[in-house]
Design a protein with these regions (language model features):
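Conserved active-site alpha-helix within GNAT-family acetyltransferase domains
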Residues: 86, 111-129
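Acetyl-CoA-dependent GNAT
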Residues: 11-78, 95, 99, 146-148, ...
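Conserved acetyl-CoA pyrophosphate-binding loop and the N-cap/start of the following alpha-helix
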Residues: 79, 83-91
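A short beta-loop-alpha structural element at the N-terminal edge
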Residues: 1-9
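Conserved catalytic-core motifs of GNAT/GCN5-like acyltransferases
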Residues: 108, 124-141
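Conserved GNAT acetyl-CoA-binding A-motif
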Residues: 98-109
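Amphipathic alpha-helical recognition patches that constitute DNA-binding helices
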Residues: 70, 104, 115
Length: 161
């Protein structure tokens, strides 16, 4: 994730009820730090989303274990609700598989966000539990997908550190 992309991400504002996903107030320098787990999804030079992996993909409150690689992300707000989530998340998972070779992926999604839950279920994720975040008290769903064989694709070319 470049500094310019990170500066863009921290301005993204989603409509209610998805505004809990806003990154306003986040430090763009942290997102752009090569040591962080944040990566930009770029299409023809334009930032369309981001994906985070490891600790940066977690919500505080779930039991931390290494049975799966945590991943989170976001799509540019004006692109949400247009059926792009599956391709964006799928591309991110391909990238994560190539880069990290995890035994499984784990996503944590706000319980109210049924739209995102449907998308990840279509990508093979299954429920692993529910918890309340320690920082906000919000309810979250945890879904896991066992690792599959690496696919062939150009996902690595679309992701930028």
């Amino acid at each position: 994730m470049t500094a310019d992309f990170a500066a863009d991400v921290v301005t993204w504002c989603y409509p209610e009820p998805y505004d809990s996903n806003d990154m306003t107030g986040a430090d763009p320098a942290f997102l752009a730090d090569p040591g962080s787990g944040f990566f930009a999804l770029v299409d023809d030079g334009a930032l369309i989303g981001f994906r985070s992996f490891g600790d940066d993909g977690q919500v505080p409150g779930w039991s931390d274990d290494d049975s799966a690689l945590d991943t989170g992300g976001g799509l540019r707000p004006e692109l949400t609700g247009q059926g792009l989530g599956r391709a964006a998340i799928g591309t991110g998972l391909e990238f994560g598989r190539e880069r990290f070779a995890p035994p499984a992926f784990r996503v944590t999604i706000a319980s109210y966000n049924v739209r995102a839950q449907r998308v990840v279920a279509a990508l093979g994720f299954r429920s692993a539990g529910r918890f309340a975040a320690t920082d906000s008290g919000r309810s979250y769903e945890v879904l896991v997908r066992p690792e599959r064989r690496p696919g062939r694709g150009q996902s690595a070319n679309r992701w930028r550190k």
